[in-house]
Design a protein with these regions (language model features):
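Residues forming anionic-ligand binding surfaces in small-molecule and nucleic-acid pockets
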Residues: 25-47, 156-157, 305, 553-569
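Feature 926 captures the class I aminoacyl-tRNA synthetase adenylation module centered on the KMSKS loop
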Residues: 52, 56-134, 138-140, 146, ...
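Structured mid-domain segments that build the active-site/substrate or prosthetic-cofactor binding neighborhood
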Residues: 235
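Short, solvent-exposed helix-loop connector elements
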Residues: 41-45, 242-250
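N-terminal beta-alpha "docking/capping" segments at the starts of catalytic domains
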Residues: 12-21, 131, 136-137, 141
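A short glycine/serine-rich beta->alpha loop
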Residues: 157-168
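Active-site "lid/cap" and pocket-lining segments within catalytic core domains
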Residues: 1-55
Length: 654
């Protein structure tokens, strides 16, 4: 018949007590009117949960029978007269016992009496203190000691542009702010409210220390860092939805965004240091930009605008995901495609354009990410900017948000590159299905993607997917094998004894030609011994299978087919690429610098030795090798599996 505390299971007994009230029912219509001027995120909370609360508003029991708290500013006389004191000056004016340095808390303020203007007797402060939510609701003006001072400062900041709290504050802070502001100013104290959902455990249960499913925030910060923890909440779901916290998702965000951004930054720093690149000595406007440079700068500015627009609309996940997508494309597409330009030893316009493009993108990314990932953004900014430009703001958080440069945006270029990316992604998926590494060259790729893509894009697809040829087709059915069978439930009665003849005729069909005929005319003509018949698609069972030697993958209306047949020449090229990959890995394992030249040693498989000997020039060029030796092993050695062939390589710094 009575509730229990959900934390300690103590019985909660209600006692009826006298209380001081604010008659909120008298301003109900004003509360509703002012709430309608606020932009709520989501709107359903403002119009629904909070709106319903206002529709059924009750008078506010504002007093508490406690010792700690703001003393209720009402003095009472035994004659029945009551007076609300409005300032220290008024209290001193009406009292002969008020010290100059009065402390406005119990017990000191309780010792101050005032003279009753009606009967002349002493008036004493009532014993109650004020509901702490009244203190919270007074924050907009109390923080500035308004109206006693800072009038202009208060008016410049009121109403607030934005506040945010958990959904349970519809009856707490959101309400107390609106209630007091309506009583005093007859307007809402805020323009925008972003409501936050509660954080739950990974199973969707409320976190509780007693249940043992609570996560210590400080431990999580120590384990993951502040930035990844913040990023998880930004990208996980809309802020107002309950959020299931689990460590795997935080780690995934670390890898997907922070590791990717940091590795891209580290790549730039490493090669910039190697060639002593100084961004203050160049201007992006003077650079001869390639298509890849123009694409990255276009995507950068599209992202700057997308993040700005989404944050302005309080769409936090959309803003964070837009930035995350850009970082992924910058790293896994632009840097991947442009690596050789950064490796170039000789200074050139092309190398300068690559460095300036990536530098611009990284600095702008740090500025855009600063509100969401403040610590990593600061580290990147200070090293990239402050270390070379002493006149720059000393912190990324003192910088202006990057300006959107519409002149840099090329929507057609972005659309075309997006289509190329889609083809490459589908091609990689097809390789995975066929269990073929990207280092193994293939003869051809076929796709029904936009045939208007120019030679530049075709070359990119060839290089990325390691194929010799790319063909754009309108009809991809030639790579699918179609077989036809009779739909027995329908054709059994219709054909009777002729059913076996129809089955035999269907088995002998050219599947691709039959499918085209059916698609074009809606019927399939069959010649039987006793005459022709026409069958509809509903009367047929049509089975599809990929033709042998081809692998296809489709998504978003685009199909990609790989010719997976391997000739001896393709296999040999695959060996060359595999050898290069193994040697590059060994360079890294041996701790060599990217500029170090090496000697290469090889013993073991005759096939691998033959491939290495026949392709020495190309292999040594890619691994910075000066010579190849087959009579001994020196330096750092490791046994390797090269496409099923066992061989031992050695790499030695020159």
């Amino acid at each position: 018949s009575y509730p229990f505390c959900w934390r300690c299971d103590t019985p909660l007994i209600y006692y009826a007590r006298e209380s001081w009230y604010i008659k909120m029912t008298d301003v109900k219509d004003k509360l509703i009117k002012n709430n309608n001027t606020v932009q709520w995120y989501p709107e359903s909370i403002g119009k629904g949960r909070f709106g319903d609360w206002l529709e059924n508003v009750q008078d506010w029991a504002v007093s508490r029978n406690r010792y700690w708290g703001t003393p209720l500013n009402i003095w009472e006389c035994e004659c029945g007269h009551r007076h609300a004191i409005g300032s220290i000056a008024e209290l001193k004016e009406m009292s002969g016992t008020c010290p100059d340095d009065i402390e406005l808390h119990r017990p000191y303020v309780d010792q101050v009496t005032i003279t009753c203007p009606h009967c002349g007797k002493e008036m004493h402060r009532v014993p109650e203190v004020i509901d702490c939510w009244f203190d919270s609701g007074s924050m907009p003006f109390a923080q500035h000691h308004y109206p006693f001072e800072n009038k202009e400062l208060f008016e410049s900041q009121f109403p607030a542009d934005f506040i945010s709290e958990a959904v349970d504050q519809t009856r707490g802070w959101f309400y107390s702010l609106l209630a007091i502001s309506t009583l005093l100013f007859d307007k809402a104290p805020f323009k925008n409210v972003l409501v936050q959902g509660l954080v739950q455990d990974e199973n969707g249960q409320k976190m509780s220390k007693s249940k043992g499913n609570a996560v210590d925030p400080m431990e999580a910060l120590q384990k993951f860092g502040a930035d990844p923890l913040r990023w998880y909440f930004y990208t996980n779901s809309a802020p107002w939805l309950p959020s299931r916290f689990h460590e795997k998702a935080v780690v995934e965000g670390q890898k997907k965004f922070f590791s990717t951004l940091w590795n891209t930054y580290a790549f730039f720093v490493m090669y910039a240091n190697i060639v002593n690149f100084d961004p203050t000595q160049h201007r992006l406007e003077d650079c001869k930009l390639t298509v890849m440079d123009k694409w990255l700068l276009s995507r950068l500015n599209t992202t700057v605008k997308a993040v700005d627009d989404n944050l302005s609309a309080y769409k936090v996940p959309e803003a964070a995901r837009a930035l995350q997508d850009f970082v992924d494309e910058m790293s896994n597409w632009y840097v991947r495609r442009s690596r050789p330009r950064f490796w170039a030893q000789a200074e050139s316009d092309d190398r300068t354009a690559a460095f300036m493009t990536l530098y611009t993108a990284l600095v702008s990314t740090a500025k855009v990410a600063a509100p969401m990932a403040p610590f990593m953004s600061e580290e990147i900014y200070r090293n990239l900017v402050c270390s070379v430009d002493k006149s720059a703001p000393e912190s990324v958080h003192l910088c202006l948000y990057p300006a959107y440069e519409e002149s840099r945006v090329d929507k057609q270029l972005e659309a075309e590159m997006d289509e190329v990316l889609q083809v490459v992604t589908l091609g990689r998926a097809a390789r995975n299905l066929s269990n073929l590494k990207n280092r193994q060259p293939l003869q051809a790729l076929y796709t029904d993607a936009n045939s208007g893509l120019g030679q530049l894009y075709t070359d990119i697809i060839k290089q990325e997917l390691n194929v010799k040829d790319v063909q754009f087709l309108t009809d991809m059915s030639q790579f699918t094998a179609y077989t036809f069978k009779p739909q027995l439930k329908l054709l059994g009665k219709k054909l009777g004894k002729r059913l076996n003849d129809a089955r035999q005729a269907l088995q002998e069909l050219d599947g691709s030609a039959a499918k085209k005929e059916l698609d074009a005319t809606g019927v399939l003509q069959l010649s039987l011994p006793d005459g022709d018949i026409a069958l509809t698609a509903e009367e047929l069972l049509i089975e599809t299978a990929q033709k042998e030697g081809y692998t296809s993958v489709s998504d978003r209306g685009v199909t990609v087919v790989l010719d997976t047949a391997l000739t001896e020449e393709l296999i040999r090229e695959g060996f060359v690429r595999e050898i290069i990959s193994k040697l590059q890995t060994m360079r890294k394992e041996a701790g060599f610098n990217v500029t170090d030249h090496i000697q290469v040693y090889c013993q073991g498989s005759e096939k691998v030795q033959q491939v290495l000997e026949e392709n020495q020039e190309a292999i040594l060029h890619d691994v910075l090798g000066d010579a190849c030796h087959f009579d001994a092993l020196e330096g750092y050695t490791a046994q390797q599996d090269v496409n099923g062939e066992t061989v031992t390589f050695g790499v030695k710094r020159v």
